[in-house]
Amino acid sequence: MKFIDRIKEDWSKVKDKPAKEKWEFFWDYYKIPAICILLVVVLLVQSILTSSNRKAIVFSGFAINCKISIKEEAFWDGFYEAAGIDGETQTAACYSDVQIMPGQIQLNNNTVQRIIAGCAIQDVDFIAGDPYAFQVCAYTSQRLFVDLREFLDEETLAKYADRLYYMDNAIIDMLNAPVGEQVEPNALEYPKDPKKPETMKNPIPVGIDVSDREDLQKAYYLDGTTIYVGAIKSTARPELTKQFLNYLLK
């Protein structure tokens, strides 16, 4: 017998009964299916409401060794306004749950691998970090950062020349040398001052010192820490990333 026919037969037995008996019959025989259907409806409604309230991520990056403060929202609201982003339906994802620390090899490797994975799927637009963290990211063999000479106009580069972070591309070449000729990262001698390209063999500007941004300092409890920001070479949102760098320089 089909399920629907069984229901019709069962209800025919109680159709002339009082409402109370009908309800008792229904509850005795169909309470489990009814509860299951109710749960499915509740979950479906909850899923629809959650999806409708979820903001679309239109920009993302990593803030390494940073801690979020109550000022973070105000910082990003300022950028949304400058970039024409609708903060009601769109948002930026700034991942500050990552660390890169001197002597913490495993921790650093995990962080770098997470960043590289995000860059590989074009889900990362920028990286911000203190001098040590930024150096570790700059000198990965994957060349994560874009050459700012190809990203920002000459006027901006000239105006902020004393704030540019340079990496020595000759070191990356050594890391990517043929097997047998490679040099271990720990054995390399990195530039002592990333703002002095004249001390490097093949300097490339990949970051900007934005430590003077008071709202950024307050947003992530930086307490005067030197912070560099660089654009990711694989970004799928280059124009928005340019706007972000220019916003930080204002």
Residue ranges and their predicted role:
Residues 7-20:
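Short, membrane-interfacial amphipathic segments enriched in basic
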Residues 20-29:
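Aromatic- and glycine-rich beta-strand/loop motifs that create alpha-glucan
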Residues 29-51:
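Hydrophobic membrane-insertion alpha-helices, especially the h-region
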